[in-house]
Amino acid sequence: MMLIIGLGNPGKEYEHTRHNIGFIALENIAKQYETSFSVKKKFHCEIAESTNNGQKLIFVKPTTYMNLSGKSVIAVKTYYNIPLEKIFVIHDDIDLELGKIKFKTGGGNGGHNGLKSIDGIIGNNYHRIRIGVGRPQNSQDVADYVLNNFSKTEYVIAEQAIDKITDNFNLILENKLEEFKSKMV
């Protein structure tokens, strides 16, 4: 069993924001496993389930807003009894250039409030797929920046990163994590 979480904020107004690239990527990955999301209030999320080669896949989009993502993660993790090494979190990263991807296990939260929430509840020894959204170019507040929509040009670059993750996601399912990591460079 594997838990794949995309971080973002619920609501139409956030749908295409930089902070929601985790949701966007997760939806793209889930689509290839022919599943759809439904709201599960007891888990504080939208959830989709599928199987691949006998392995159950649970896709989760927390509906708690970014800063409380851990509430949803612990609810699903506990219900399904999923160990940390089978948890993958996809999220935006302002410290990475737009479209760059990094895969890592454990580590700090880099000031990301969604990760802070998760780390505070389950610890930090889970896998992260970090998708670069870049930093604001001027004196724009970081919170405003990540809560703004991508420009059309930026969205094309973001989609290319999402496609790269989706196209290679099978490597994660096959537990070829180092190979997945090398393909993200």
Curated annotation (Swiss-Prot):
In short, the EC number is 3.1.1.29
**What are the protein's UniProt keywords?**
Cytoplasm, Hydrolase, RNA-binding, tRNA-binding
Q: Where is this site: Discriminates between blocked and unblocked aminoacyl-tRNA?
A: 9
* Principal cellular location given in the protein's record: cytoplasm
| Gene3D superfamilies on file | Peptidyl-tRNA hydrolase (3.40.50.1470)
Instruction: Note the PROSITE patterns from the entry.
Output: PEPT_TRNA_HYDROL_1 (PS01195), PEPT_TRNA_HYDROL_2 (PS01196)
Q: Where is the active site?
A: 19 (proton acceptor)
Q: Name one GO biological process term.
A: rescue of stalled ribosome
Cystines in this chain: none
Which CDD domains does this entry report, sorted A to Z?
A: PTH
Q: GO molecular function, one example?
A: tRNA binding
Positions of the record's site feature: Stabilizes the basic form of H active site to accept a proton: 92
Identify the HAMAP family for this entry.
Pept_tRNA_hydro_bact (MF_00083)
UniProt function note: Hydrolyzes ribosome-free peptidyl-tRNAs (with 1 or more amino acids incorporated), which drop off the ribosome during protein synthesis, or as a result of ribosome stalling.
Stated family: Belongs to the PTH family.
Quaternary structure, per UniProt, is: Monomer.
Q: State the protein's name.
A: Peptidyl-tRNA hydrolase
Q: What is the lineage of its organism?
A: Bacteria, Pseudomonadati, Pseudomonadota, Alphaproteobacteria, Rickettsiales
